[in-house]
């Protein structure tokens, strides 16, 4: 279960390097450098061996494509707040909400892929948003570049709980740029939490030589262990 990992992630030195400076907005977007994942599966079955490709318009050749180089719309923040001056709620549905979390699902034409905007409420005025893609029992989450926003440790812990308890995924994949200054710290921290480095060519991740992927597999209790 992920519970034992959550305490470690709250105390990890990686998430301790949070911003303590100016806060330009009450809503913080946690995808500052890597654009939205757009993930499409090849094959109809949801299994660990299902192959996944992540598409974008920056690569016009065949094979997996991911992360557009062109500007993308800001996150769809409930209530129409944030960096956007327009209310994007018309293209998103409320998926889940509790006292800590508000999750909207973007409407897409692909019924095998689901795109979520996850907003964790740290205080009444402080929110942090993550964008994630759900496909074939896998959740793909981007780790932003630079220092993580203040409160990211609590926000990410809530996101992991949501992935396990509400989405019931088998794996959570994180990705971040290889050339970031704290890459070594991220690798150590997430390895300690149970994440493993995903080698190039893995069927569940796209071909991205500039990105590092790590995977966490949730441990499910069997019926025999529960007795």
Swiss-Prot record:
InterPro entries: Acyl_CoA_acyltransferase, ODC_AZ, ODC_AZ_sf. It holds the Pfam family ODC_AZ. Coiled coil: none annotated. Residues 20-50 are annotated as: Disordered. One of its GO terms (biological process) is positive regulation of intracellular protein transport. Interacts with ODC1 and thereby sterically blocks ODC homodimerization. Forms a ternary complex with PSMB4 and OAZ1 before PSMB4 is incorporated into the 20S proteasome. Interacts with AZIN2; this interaction disrupts the interaction between the antizyme and ODC1. Interacts with FAM171A1. This is Ornithine decarboxylase antizyme 1. It comes from Bos taurus (Bovine). The lineage of its organism: Eukaryota, Metazoa, Chordata, Craniata, Vertebrata. The gene is OAZ1.
């Amino acid at each position: 279960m992920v519970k034992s990992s959550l305490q470690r992630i709250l105390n990890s030195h990686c998430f301790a390097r949070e911003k303590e400076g100016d806060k330009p907005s009450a809503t913080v977007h946690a995808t500052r450098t890597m654009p939205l994942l757009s993930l499409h599966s090849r094959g109809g079955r949801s299994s660990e061996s299902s192959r996944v490709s992540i598409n974008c318009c920056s690569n016009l050749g065949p094979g997996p494509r991911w992360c557009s180089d062109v500007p993308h719309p800001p996150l769809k923040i409930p209530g129409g707040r944030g960096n956007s001056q327009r209310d994007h709620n018309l293209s998103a549905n409320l998926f889940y909400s509790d006292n800590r979390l508000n999750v909207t699902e973007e409407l897409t034409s692909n019924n095998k892929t689901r795109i979520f905007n996850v907003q964790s409420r740290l205080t009444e005025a402080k929110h942090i948003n993550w964008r994630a893609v759900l496909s074939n029992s896998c959740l793909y989450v981007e780790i932003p570049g630079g220092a993580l926003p203040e409160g990211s440790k609590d926000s990410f812990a809530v996101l992991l709980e949501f992935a396990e308890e509400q989405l019931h995924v088998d794996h959570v994949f994180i990705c971040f740029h290889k050339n970031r200054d704290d890459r070594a710290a991220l690798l150590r921290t997430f390895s300690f939490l149970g994440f493993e480095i995903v080698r190039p060519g893995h069927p569940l991740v796209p071909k991205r030589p500039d990105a590092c992927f790590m995977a966490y597999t949730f441990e499910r209790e069997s019926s025999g262990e529960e007795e």
